[in-house]
Swiss-Prot record:
Family: Belongs to the class-II aminoacyl-tRNA synthetase family.
Organism: Nitrobacter winogradskyi (strain ATCC 25391 / DSM 10237 / CIP 104748 / NCIMB 11846 / Nb-255)
Molecular function GO terms recorded: alanine-tRNA ligase activity; aminoacyl-tRNA deacylase activity; ATP binding; tRNA binding; zinc ion binding
Cofactor(s) required, per the database record: Zn(2+)
Protein name: Alanine--tRNA ligase
The reaction(s) this protein catalyses: tRNA(Ala) + L-alanine + ATP = L-alanyl-tRNA(Ala) + AMP + diphosphate
Gene: alaS
Taxonomic classification: Bacteria, Pseudomonadati, Pseudomonadota, Alphaproteobacteria, Hyphomicrobiales
Domain of life of the native organism: Bacteria
Biological processes per GO annotation: alanyl-tRNA aminoacylation; negative regulation of DNA-templated transcription
Amino acid sequence: MSGVNDIRSAFLNYFAANGHQIVPSSPLVPRNDPTLMFTNAGMVQFKNVFTGVEKRPYQRATTSQKCVRAGGKHNDLDNVGYTARHHTFFEMLGNFSFGDYFKDRAIELAWKLVTQEFGLPKDRLTATVYIDDDGAFDLWKKIAGLPESRIIRIAGSDNFWQMGDTGPCGPCSEIFYDHGDRIPGGPPGSPEQDGDRFVEIWNLVFMQYEKLPDGSRPNLPKPSIDTGAGLERVAAVLQGKHDNYDIDLFVALIRAAADLTGADPQGPMKASLRVIADHLRASSFLIADGVLPSNEGRGYVLRRIMRRAMRHAQLLGAREPLMWRLVGVLVREMGEAFPELQRARPLIEETLRLEETRFRKTLERGLSILDEKSASLKQGDMFDGETAFTLYDTYGFPLDLTQDALRARGIGVDLASFTDAMEQQKAKARASWSGSGEAAAESIWFPLREKLGATEFLGYETEAAEGVVAALVKDGEEADTLKAGESGAIVLNQTPFYGESGGQVGDTGFLIADGVRFRVTDTQKKAGDLFVHLGTVEQGVLAPGMALALEVDHDRRSAIRANHSATHLLHEALRQVLGDHIAQRGSLVAPERLRFDFAHNKPISADELRCIEDIANDVVLENGEVTTRLMAVDDAREAGARALFGEKYGDEVRVVSMGGTDRHGAASNALGWSVELCGGTHVKRTGDIGLISVVGESAVASGVRRIEALTGHQARHHANHAIQLAKTAAGELRTSLDDMPARIASLMEERKKLERELSEARKKLAMGGAASASSGATTGVRDVGGIKLMARSVEGIEIKDLKSLADQGKKQLGSGVVALVATSGDGKASVVVGVTPDLVTRFSAVDLVRKASEVLGGKGGGGKPDMAQAGGPDGAKAGAALDAIAAAMGA
């Protein structure tokens, strides 16, 4: 049972046998806490259960939770690889009680597991309790039989946990394993506690109080249990290892990296192998959970982790991308416990390979500058922070890589001057921005929201209603009236007009009263839930308090509804075809078309696009009902609803479902095939979409792809236009639509043949009469100081053929220089110069070709002494360019 996979299974099965529900690990991107960078503890997915906001169908749970600590307050990145127990990615084993059992049962379950199931000797175990937790102290004596000398009272935050400044909190009790006196260090609470002899393997949190704003801590009506045991630490103890990196999982990863680089796992580069093994896990699991490298947020943290590992791969002598080649080993070790690794393996490998390929250029440039700037420094010196900032700001070389590269030489970085340089740059950026009228105008909406309250939205039920003008805004200020011809904004007490949000554009239409007509050209949401109608008064005068008839443009709204529903179907179809890593990165839902951006880092093939389109249209043709329901946000997520990360959702959310639960790919407990949290407007049945036609696929950023599509009438018009173009083309080719591909292929082959023949004819024409070159009678061959120069201007010959002609000319001359200028239809010119071997000590083809390039308006040229090429935009000066070569030879 000592293998990591066996230990994980034993832990979960033990608690399952004791009435706990085995709950899968939640993603590394927290679903219910937008303030948290990454999931960093087992209790994160149960946070709302502990606070009473969420109810689950079980009161006891057990998990092995994926965790990352590499950003913000919990940042272990700099220590990884250099200590025995720091990791960016780790698994947290845990058991939880939500108002069921409490302190006595938690201690009993933990003690039996570590001593009976895991077989750890009791005399190697020590427990800590909070300084005034007499109950836990007595229970450890009673249940575990520990002597008082091995139950240590600890004051401070290490043994008292709280969720925040207020809320559930309680004392902790930790179990420590004693590695023995061969390892330096003392028990917890002693002056030597920072040594490695005593290792914490399990933390039991007894949530029994609620901290109030006044600082008091009354008892919770239902106390709960939250425990956490680091799997890697537990495995090290059970495998008789003092170092986490010596457990079977890491040994496999480190050995694979060592085999690929030739490094010794126990040699001087041991830390680099450990960094690669650890960071491979973090990178792979983050990518599998939908995070891709970028320059902000979670993507930036991922990029830092990846690039730190890639820096260490370079230190090991890797000349080609390395990390992607290790993914198979990771999948073999952890893929059974975490199937998402297997599903996302192609994406993980491709992302790592591409990122490492890109980073090598940055790394080489940055290291070169770093070596140059630090050459005079010795151990104990500080590297200039301003230079470190220049490396970061100008060359994209992260600060932590600068620190890491200098660390091996015992050189630090002046962080104070680095921070000063960073702040100076920010100040310059602020000073260079003078603000805008638009930004100033935006400031009005927050006080208006405070005064008027939220606008009631009626648009899910109707496109026409009545409303009362609550406020008028003109030129960024409240106005008493809006007159005919004036533009401004209107806030109503209620509206059927949808305000732009969630990628869906705002509605247009009219606001009407007797003698008054206001054309709405856009509707926006300001200050959260204030609907603002932008437009122009076409007739009459508007004033606050006026009652208006509100009419949304029906045809435009219908087209938007179809496009929004189609976006949901395409999102799910993309996930079905490309994998579970697909995550929305942005969208545009307009009446004319839709656009959907998503995490994926390689182009989608034509076959994949066709499959995505077919799957989405199958759901359209089923004409199933599109259902919307209001649900508690956590109930919706439990039912499989997908949320757009970054969106803030209230306690109650709108859930839009399409497609039957019996469709392939629908979750067993889902509300439908496509289930998303969405506040937009949608069709009533999928058939109302009409048709979905994907018309574009492209890259918009690193790791982000975009598809564009049409629906309904727009899709039909697009299809009809394409068919008509095909028919016209078939007519011109005198063939049928079915035979047109073969006809085009035949014509293309014929064209290639003719182009080859034309190229050969041009080359023969260009070199015509050269056989007489040795006699000096050939046109284009001149004598320059006793040296033969074959100088010719030709048309329509490509650069590769021009080089071939130059080689041919050199052979024909025997001894001499060949200069050929080829002009093209766009007026540009290419020039090639060849020098026979006997003359390269006198004339350099590179020097001669650069003289010609100057005349042609080009910028230099390059090649070898015997053959060089260049170009320029001014082909009309081909003759002058040849004369310049002759002059350079001494004519």
